[in-house]
Amino acid sequence: MSTMTINGRVEPLPDDPESLLIDVVRDALKLTGTKLVCGAGVCGACTVLVDGVPVVSCLMPARAAAGKSVTTVEGIGAGKLHAVQKAFMAHDALQCGFCTPGFIVEAAAFHDRWRASKGTATPSREDIGAALSGHLCRCGAYVGICAAIREAFEAGVTR
């Protein structure tokens, strides 16, 4: 039986070749922070990290996660709030909240990659926009979301 590590725990993967990663995350493991919205990989609400890389879990076969490390929104921050999560709270960067988990996972990965490669420099609006280009917010909370992400960088807090 194949396994993956999800949020630090080793979990079995189903043998069903039709099973998607989102199904395992939400239905089998009851990690319901990850949302299924479009089912076509265009909204970003189902974003998780696979070996540190953001992927849309609604398109990824569960079997493709075998031997890999998966992080859901519940695992971001490793037991404490990530700088992005703190900034989202400070800026009230959500409305209905359905897109928020995907934005947080993507933004946290972007934050950590940026810090690792560019140190304390703050990304431009264009850099932030490019990092979030695969995410949709039906409520239009983009101004607050981008402000929160920018603050996560300006605060100088990494974790």
What are these regions (language model features)?
Residues M1-R159:
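Signature of N-terminal electron-transfer/Fe-S-associated modules in redox systems
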